[in-house]
């Protein structure tokens, strides 16, 4: 096949490059809250409950951004929505340098709004740019999100100090400004808008009038809460260990968690060749539970890194596999009507991260708060067994 070197094709390739770079930066911004939480807590003299409200602030902003994505894309196109999202993240991340708790909370709301607007916009624009290879294109795109998440902790450790995040947030602001501006210019040439008003003519299968859909949504509520709680609190949890093993300080539990999270995404297609969605989910949940148990009982950074690696690998395939189950159950067009599913995930993330901080403050021990993660895993295993048994009953009848 002769390579396509037309100006339009070259423009699309450059835009794709910028979108992947933007998604990498967005991955860093998404998990930034967990990495700066110990610094903000020390600077503002916060207990875990007060710090936990920052999670609610960010996820509230993210929920607003997700809700407003469709009308903003309709009005300004994907490029305009992404630029607005990057601008919000820029303003929010700089606001984290304030010495006022309320200003920092507002900054997390603004940052969350940018994240909630940017991630779906980049995903949808990637679909528009790759109509023939949607699945591999999205998998490759989300790999870059994972890379950004992996390097967030080392980035903050290298450029920040125990009491200041001015330098790393300033660097992120510059990257957001340059990348957002470049995406705006690159996407201006061909304004791509999603035809959200287009409804399938073939009477789509009902979704949210069924109990199965809401059970899958509850599954998403708890699981996204687990992922957010782990990613958000594991850095603080590791820093409070009485036995700090300096020999493994570089391979921190946070770094290990996100590293094996990305590796798990790569390994998932191999397992999918031999296992269906239900068995994949159960295997992932059992692996995750093992990792969480090691996390809770570990007393050195090395043991925590091991538990975080196992938990990250186990949980990595659960969200996409649950989405695949949702689509397989309700049809290929179900993703266009999956808004309640994503809302449940955002609400679960806000509740779980806050609950961990609340329990930690009341028992004066973050380990008690982290038990919420184990409870989440056990609940998900029970729910998955129920959904699996229910699906077998439905098929047999």
Task: Show which residues each predicted segment covers.
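Extracytoplasmic gate region of multi-pass secondary transporters
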Residues: 33-34, 211-262
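Short hydrophobic/small-residue motifs within alpha-helical transmembrane segments
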Residues: 58-60, 146-147, 257-262, 346-348
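Extracytoplasmic
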Residues: 15, 21-40, 46, 230-235
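Interfacial helix-cap and linker-helix signal at transmembrane-aqueous boundaries
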Residues: 40-41, 72-73, 155-163, 238-239, ...
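C-terminal transmembrane helical hairpin of 12-TM major facilitator-type secondary transporters
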Residues: 278-322
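Helix-loop-helix hairpin linking two adjacent transmembrane segments in secondary transporters
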Residues: 101, 132-133, 140-188
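Cytoplasmic helix-loop-helix junction between adjacent transmembrane helices
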Residues: 108-143
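Conserved MFS/SLC helix-loop-helix module at the cytosolic interface between two early adjacent transmembrane helices
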Residues: 64-102
């Amino acid at each position: 096949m002769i390579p396509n070197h037309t100006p339009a094709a070259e423009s699309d390739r450059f835009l794709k490059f910028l979108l992947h770079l933007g998604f990498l930066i967005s991955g860093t911004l998404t998990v930034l809250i967990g990495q700066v939480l110990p610094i903000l807590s020390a600077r503002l003299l916060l207990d875990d409950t007060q710090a936990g409200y920052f999670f609610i602030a960010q996820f509230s902003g993210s929920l607003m951004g997700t809700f407003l994505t469709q009308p903003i894309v309709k009005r300004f196109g994907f490029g305009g929505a992404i630029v607005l999202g990057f601008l919000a993240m820029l303003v929010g991340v700089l606001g984290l340098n304030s010495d006022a708790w309320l200003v920092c909370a507002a900054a997390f709301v603004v940052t969350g709004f940018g994240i909630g607007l940017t991630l779906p916009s980049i995903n949808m624009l990637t679909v528009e740019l790759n109509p023939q290879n949607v699945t591999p294109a999205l998998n490759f795109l989300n790999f870059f999100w994972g890379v950004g998440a992996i390097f967030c902790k080392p980035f903050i450790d290298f450029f920040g100090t125990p009491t200041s995040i001015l330098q790393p947030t300033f660097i992120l602001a510059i990257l957001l400004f340059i990348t957002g501006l470049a995406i705006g210019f690159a996407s201006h040439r061909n304004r791509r808008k999603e035809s959200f008003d287009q409804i399938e003519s073939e009477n789509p299968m009902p979704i949210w009038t069924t109990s199965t859909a809401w059970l899958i949504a509850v599954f998403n509520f708890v699981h996204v809460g687990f992922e957010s709680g782990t990613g958000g609190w594991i850095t603080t949890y590791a820093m409070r260990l009485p036995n700090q093993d300096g020999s493994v300080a570089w391979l921190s539990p946070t770094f290990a968690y996100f590293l094996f999270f990305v590796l798990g995404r790569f390994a998932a297609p191999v397992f999918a060749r031999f296992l269906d969605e239900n068995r994949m989910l159960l295997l992932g949940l059992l692996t995750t539970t093992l990792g969480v148990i090691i996390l809770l009982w570990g007393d050195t950074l090395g043991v925590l890194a091991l538990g975080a690696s196992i938990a990250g690998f186990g949980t990595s395939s659960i969200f996409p596999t649950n989405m695949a189950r949702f689509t397989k159950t309700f049809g290929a067009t179900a993703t266009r009507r999956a808004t309640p599913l994503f809302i449940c995930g955002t609400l679960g993330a806000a509740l779980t991260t806050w609950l961990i901080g609340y329990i930690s403050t009341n028992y004066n021990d973050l380990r008690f708060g982290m038990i919420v993660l184990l409870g989440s895993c056990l609940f998900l295993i029970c729910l998955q067994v129920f959904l699996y048994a229910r699906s077998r009953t439905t098929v047999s009848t």
